[in-house]
């Protein structure tokens, strides 16, 4: 039996399964990768919004990471919601010890409902502790604005933001997601690396059920990097995956429902049992 590749997510929770660690693990599974999860925050949230947040002490995060890394090494790592500077420093310690492992940052700052998930001091700390270590960062437009300080209202500003990530912050790659711009029927994303800029376009689906799209998108990139894919290939797969997951949303909950993490499997005919 061939051992599966392993992807590790370090993020907050969502008891309704649409975002955070829960969404990441489902996305890993759908990509054929074994998922592991370290919890940073217990988040009481649902499709209607965020009700309560309980950030774990950084020592508890350290204990979880120690359990993982003392037993096995993941082939790729992603971080999502990290609400305190101490926890960022804890995670940085492990990343510095394993610099060869691909690292993806989903800089979770706002919930889909608009609720803030990170204070200003922690946002500043993110730029100095984790972003310079990232193989790729996956901000949406509001997150890119928060990190760069720009008002991104044009393609020119997106290009400027991308250069800030690469040339000033020091990230190896960044994909700025244009899904929050409702100006066109096309969702256009921009991948920046030291080699230049590449764009990805997909149809924009008119639906409110997009809870957890950022988590899912970055998780698929992480899973594909764990399998040894090149960054461009990983992003290309993630774009197809997220488009299908939005197109076939399960319409769960009374608010902004989650995407369908198993739509890609269904399309490929790999998981017919899920519908039984």
UniProtKB/Swiss-Prot annotation:
GO biological process assignments: thiamine biosynthetic process; thiamine diphosphate biosynthetic process
Binding, 4-amino-5-hydroxymethyl-2-methylpyrimidine: 45
GO molecular function, one term: phosphomethylpyrimidine kinase activity
Enzyme kind, highest EC tier: transferase
Classification via InterPro entries: HMP/HMP-P_kinase_dom, PM/HMP-P_kinase-1, Ribokinase-like
Keyword Nucleotide-binding set for record: yes
Keywords for this protein: ATP-binding, Kinase, Nucleotide-binding, Thiamine biosynthesis, Transferase
One Pfam family from the record: Phos_pyr_kin
GO cellular component assignments: cytosol
Similarity section: Belongs to the ThiD family.
Protein name in the entry: Hydroxymethylpyrimidine/phosphomethylpyrimidine kinase
Species name: Staphylococcus aureus (strain MSSA476)
């Amino acid at each position: 039996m061939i051992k599966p590749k392993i992807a590790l997510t370090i993020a907050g929770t969502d008891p309704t399964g649409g975002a955070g660690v829960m969404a990441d693990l489902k996305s890993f599974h759908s990509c054929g990768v074994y998922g592991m999860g370290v919890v940073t925050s217990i988040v009481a949230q649902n499709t209607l919004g965020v009700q309560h947040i309980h950030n774990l002490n950084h020592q508890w995060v350290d204990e979880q990471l120690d359990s993982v890394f003392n037993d096995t090494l993941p082939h790729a790592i992603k971080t999502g919601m990290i609400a305190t500077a101490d926890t960022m420093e804890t995670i940085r310690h492990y990343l510095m010890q394993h610099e060869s492992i691909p690292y993806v940052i989903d800089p979770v700052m706002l919930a889909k409902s608009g609720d803030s998930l990170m204070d200003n001091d922690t946002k500043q700390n993110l730029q100095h502790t984790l972003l310079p270590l990232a193989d790729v960062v996956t901000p949406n437009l509001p997150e890119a604005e928060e990190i760069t300080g720009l008002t991104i209202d044009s393609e020119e500003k997106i290009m400027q933001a991308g250069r800030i990530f690469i040339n000033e912050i020091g990230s190896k790659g960044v994909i700025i997601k244009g899904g929050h711009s409702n100006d066109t029927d096309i969702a256009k994303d921009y991948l920046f690396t030291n080699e230049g800029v590449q764009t990805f376009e997909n149809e924009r689906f008119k639906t409110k059920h997009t809870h957890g799209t950022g988590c899912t998108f970055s998780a698929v990139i992480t899973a594909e990097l764990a399998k040894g894919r090149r960054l461009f290939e990983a992003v290309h797969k993630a774009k197809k995956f997220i488009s299908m997951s939005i197109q076939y949303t399960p319409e769960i909950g009374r608010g902004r429902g989650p995407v369908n993490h198993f739509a890609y499997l269904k399309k490929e005919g790999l998981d017919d049992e899920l519908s039984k």
